Design a protein with these regions (language model features):
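PP2C/PPM-type serine/threonine phosphatase catalytic domain
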Residues: 1-285
Length: 285
């Protein structure tokens, strides 16, 4: 696969997203994206700007070595989680974490070539769109539009109407509900996510991509172009991202919409903007 475009931008001072790939731009053998989960602890404990950014940086560094191994994605994930557990233990050994500490987590999507075919792994709600070798479009894993997110966005809008505009204040108010939702991480009744816990290996999704012609990995901040703002369908997002300068152009269009609706009234959402990341790949010819 050839790297057509890659972009990652934070919505604020700290970008909790991340991306990486193996090989060079003309011959990519694996690629991945991260979407760090916004912390609700009231302060950061682990350095790196935020606890989520710390986890993303550690996981990215480990993946640069692990993704090159001739191992199934399931085993690569297992080794990644083991290293993160060791990292977290070292980082917190002298810290007095609160009893209700919300540990760092991140969405992870990775694709890897195995001889002539490609496999994929997903933890969390980032997106993986692909077009098969026959030209047929395949939405392997799109970002879910879940009921809790809609409820949270609606409640946040009420607070903004009353003059509460700071996201940190909103996070503090809704912390009990967010904590309850995060207790469902990596559980049968919840959702999979990357964290420094053995359970993170149990709830990943795996996909056989066959011999795709094109692949787009993107976080939900980038996929807002589809499910929030209606700028694209899944197929047109894939096509636009694969154009020359496409990922930057798509991100510019997202920023334009967000700048025109800072109070989140026209497009209901919890935060005015989100970190956004995308990697676009096309089969070499």
């Amino acid at each position: 696969m050839r790297l057509v475009g890659a972009v990652t931008q934070g919505s604020g001072a700290i970008n909790e997203d991340g991306l990486g790939y193996l090989g060079n731009a003309e011959d990519v053998s694996a690629a991945w994206i991260f979407d760090g989960v916004t912390g609700i602890n009231g302060q950061n404990f682990l350095g790196g700007g935020s606890d989520a950014a710390w986890l993303v940086a550690k996981a990215h560094d480990h993946l640069k070595a692990l993704a090159s191994l001739d191992l199934p994605l399931r085993e690569i994930l297992s080794k990644l989680v083991q290293t993160l557990i060791a990292d977290f233990k070292t980082a917190t050994k002298d810290l007095d974490l609160p009893e209700d500490y919300d540990p760092p987590a991140a969405c992870l999507t990775i694709v890897k070539r195995y001889r002539e075919t490609w496999q994929a792994l997903r933890l969390g709600d980032s997106c993986l769109l692909a077009r098969g070798g026959d030209g047929a479009h395949l939405s392997v894993a799109a970002s879910p539009n879940n009921a809790f997110d809609h409820w949270l966005s609606a409640e946040a809008l009420k607070r903004r109407d009353a003059g509460m505009l700071d996201v940190k204040e909103l996070l503090a108010e809704f912390r009990p509900q967010l904590m309850q939702g995060r207790k469902l991480r990596n559980s049968p009744s919840g959702y999979g996510i990357l964290e420094a816990s053995p359970s993170a290996t149990e709830f990943a999704e795996y996909f056989d991509l066959g011999t795709p012609r094109e692949i787009l990995l993107c976080t939900d901040g980038y996929f807002r172009a589809v499910d929030y703002y209606g700028l694209h369908s899944e197929q047109s997002l894939l096509e636009a991202s694969l154009a020359s300068g496409g990922v930057d152009s798509v991100l510019d269009s997202i920023h334009s919409v967000e700048a025109s609706d800072p109070a989140c009234v026209k497009y209901l959402r919890f935060k005015p903007a989100d970190d956004a990341t995308a990697v676009a790949l096309r089969k070499r010819v």
